[in-house]
Amino acid sequence: MRVKKGDLVEVIAGKDRGKRGKVLRVIPREDRVIVEGINIVHRHMRPTPDMPQGGIVKNEAPIHISNVMLVCPNCDEKTRIGATYLEDGQKVRKCKKCDEVVDK
């Protein structure tokens, strides 16, 4: 997967199209990511010892990886990602638009 935890992504399809958020969790087995503030669902929680009152809780639900694009930290545009190798042999991700390295 080309998106990692902590990356800034933009939603390109679905009800939250155009919104940006930080990746909180990547689920590679299901090709899904959980993005902060995106795909909010309401869970009706029964009272438990942890939450004695119960109620409606808002959580982020996973969104398919094909519905998000990485936002390049250098050019601040949504972009596709390519891979390249540095002089020391380390594989890094790079922006296809500005050709800069995305990884820290």
Curated annotation (Swiss-Prot):
CDD domains: KOW_RPL26. Keywords: Ribonucleoprotein, Ribosomal protein, RNA-binding, rRNA-binding. It holds the Pfam family ribosomal_L24. One of its GO terms (biological process) is translation. Transmembrane segments: none annotated. InterPro entries: KOW, Rib_uL2_dom2, Ribosomal_uL24, Ribosomal_uL24_CS, Ribosomal_uL24_KOW, Translation_prot_SH3-like_sf. It comes from the Bacteria. One of its GO terms (molecular function) is structural constituent of ribosome. GO terms for cellular component: ribonucleoprotein complex; ribosome. PROSITE patterns: RIBOSOMAL_L24 (PS01108). Part of the 50S ribosomal subunit. HAMAP family: Ribosomal_uL24_B (MF_01326_B). PANTHER family: MITOCHONDRIAL RIBOSOMAL PROTEIN L24. Belongs to the universal ribosomal protein uL24 family. One of two assembly initiator proteins, it binds directly to the 5'-end of the 23S rRNA, where it nucleates assembly of the 50S subunit. One of the proteins that surrounds the polypeptide exit tunnel on the outside of the subunit. This is Large ribosomal subunit protein uL24. It comes from Halothermothrix orenii (strain H 168 / OCM 544 / DSM 9562). The lineage of its organism: Bacteria, Bacillati, Bacillota, Clostridia, Halanaerobiales. The gene is rplX.
